[in-house]
């Protein structure tokens, strides 16, 4: 279980993963329990609502509305309070990590004035902030961020080689080992064959994979559109 290094005798229940024994770990335990309670109560209510709308098409809007209007605000409000109250210890770091999983970029920006130097000095916090900066750079309406790799012949290839040339470019991120990716290839092929003469370009970007496996999958799946390979591990 997780616990916070603190002066005193720290006890961790290996069955419940609950840390006790010091003031900081008691606060950590209470924070985790409160977050779990907010989620459990919210999702229990959603389960009841689902009984009224078992159809997936009817259910999805209900789920989204309740989560956005009830669960998420309650969760973020509590976590923000914990961050501000614990900006110089591990409880605040935990709350910040959990907050980052539910907030949007505007909410993260608004939080920056509330956290202190200690939290900002942590590598975990810096990595999270970097991720949100990347999200802002790649948000809808922003210029695309170029991607570089090589094509199947080993020549350098970039996303910018295809975007801005007067075509519609559909970027498909995939890997030879990704079963859901492979299952979608026939659908992409149908779309590509239907619209390729009307300005549609599909660019496959194969990631987290080995070149020989990518090449074999391209042949096996009859992928006739351009590919950009990123074989870095």
Language-model features, listed with the residues they occupy:
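A non-transmembrane, solvent-exposed segment enriched in polar/low-complexity residues
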Residues: 1-74
């Amino acid at each position: 279980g997780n616990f916070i290094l603190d002066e005193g005798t720290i006890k961790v229940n290996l069955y419940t993963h609950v840390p006790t024994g010091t003031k900081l770990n008691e606060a950590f335990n209470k924070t985790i329990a409160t977050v779990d309670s907010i989620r459990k109560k919210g999702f229990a209510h959603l389960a009841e609502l689902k009984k009224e709308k078992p159809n997936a098409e009817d259910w999805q809007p209900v789920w989204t509305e309740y989560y956005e209007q009830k669960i998420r605000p309650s969760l973020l409000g509590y976590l923000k309070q914990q961050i501000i109250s614990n900006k110089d210890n591990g409880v605040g770091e935990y709350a910040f990590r959990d907050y980052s999983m539910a907030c949007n970029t505007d909410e993260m920006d608004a939080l920056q004035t509330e956290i202190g130097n200690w939290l900002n000095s942590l590598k975990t916090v810096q990595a999270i902030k970097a991720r949100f900066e990347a999200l802002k750079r790649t948000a809808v309406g922003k210029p695309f961020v170029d991607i570089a790799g090589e094509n199947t012949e080993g020549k350098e290839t970039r996303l910018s080689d295809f975007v801005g040339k007067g075509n519609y470019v559909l970027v498909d991120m995939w890997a030879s080992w990704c079963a859901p990716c492979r299952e979608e290839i026939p659908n992409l092929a149908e779309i590509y064959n239907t619209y390729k003469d009307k300005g549609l370009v599909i660019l496959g970007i194969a990631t987290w994979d080995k070149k020989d496996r990518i090449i074999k999958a391209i042949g096996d799946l009859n992928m006739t559109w351009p590919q950009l390979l990123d074989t870095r591990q």
